Amino acid sequence: HSLTDGLRILRLAIDTHLVTARYAFPLLIARPGGLVVEVTDGTAEYNADHYRLNVYYDLAKIAPIRLARSWAHELAPHGATAVAITPGWLRSEIMLHEYGVTEENWRDACAKEPHFAISETARFVGRAVAALAADEQRERWQGRSLSSGGLAKEYGFTDLDGSRPDAWRYVVEVQDAGKPADVTGYR
């Protein structure tokens, strides 16, 4: 990456969060109970041990986790909670397009990429955020890095197909370990 491109990545990944916070936080702390959710790619544990592509991209992926920790310190005195949440292997529109499938036939992509079997819909991470927002004791998660799969176990919600994909555990234990794709015990 060029310096110009790398700095642009960081501006989009970090500055936008800081600018949003500058204007949103006064509203958020007007009364206790606010929630800030930084969405990123990868848990703190995973990202601590895995370098991502180049220095700019790597920083962009870890920055929201650190922002959540920083926001937690700044917002806690106002009764607000800040966390970072990562979806698993997200079955987004771009991923479906990349594999030439739709949400209805997404499993066909597993012929090209067998580990895609652990993927989840965007609704799954949305349900994670909704469950967290509805939790009156959500401050127990203050400053933490969470995953949609981990929160599904905690709160009992499922993805659209009724499963609970635990993608980050799968990535570590199966995909990164070089094992054949098998989502048994991970969905």
Question: Whereabouts are the PLM-identified features?
Answer:
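Conserved catalytic Lys-bearing alpha helix of Rossmann-like short-chain dehydrogenase/reductases
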Residues: 14-17, 59-68, 82, 125
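Catalytic Tyr-X3-Lys loop
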Residues: 1-19, 37, 64
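Short aromatic-enriched loop/helix-cap "lid" or pocket-rim segments at secondary-structure transitions
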Residues: 50-51, 94-98, 155-160
